[in-house]
């Protein structure tokens, strides 16, 4: 009887652990898609005037300016658009 009860408890614990792992993976996927969605919205606000990487692609320290916005040159990592870029946000 003791062995049977221990087996059932072990089985329940294993099932609960795998469910938690699935929840964590689902949350990671959701966070990643939210992050990329935010990046796309952030990019839409920028009107690029000068080229960030004109002083050398590795330096990523060229001039970056946006009309009526706060901007900086930096490395952007997103699907299909990675590299040095001007990131801007509205001045509030």
From Swiss-Prot:
Subcellular location as annotated: Secreted
Keyword Disulfide bond: yes
Record PTM text: Contains 5 disulfide bonds.
GO cellular component: extracellular region
Signal peptide: 1-19
Tissues expressing the protein: Expressed by the venom duct.
Coiled-coil annotated residue ranges, if any: none
Residues excised as propeptide: 20-44
Keyword line: Disulfide bond, Neurotoxin, Pyrrolidone carboxylic acid, Secreted, Signal, Toxin
GO MF entry, a single one: toxin activity
Residue numbers bearing the Pyrrolidone carboxylic acid modification: 45
Family under the similarity heading: Belongs to the conotoxin S superfamily.
Domain notes: The cysteine framework is VIII (C-C-C-C-C-C-C-C-C-C).
Descriptive protein name: Conotoxin Ac8.1
Species for this entry: Conus achatinus (Little frog cone)
């Amino acid at each position: 009887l003791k062995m049977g009860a221990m087996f059932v408890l072990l089985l329940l614990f294993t099932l609960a652990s795998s469910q938690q792992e699935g929840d964590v993976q689902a949350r990671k996927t959701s966070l990643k898609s939210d992050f990329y969605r935010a990046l796309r919205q952030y990019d839409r606000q920028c009107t690029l005037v000068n080229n960030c990487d004109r002083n050398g692609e590795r330096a990523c320290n060229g001039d970056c300016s946006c009309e009526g916005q706060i901007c900086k040159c930096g490395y952007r990592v997103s699907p299909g658009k990675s590299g040095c870029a001007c990131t801007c946000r509205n001045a509030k």
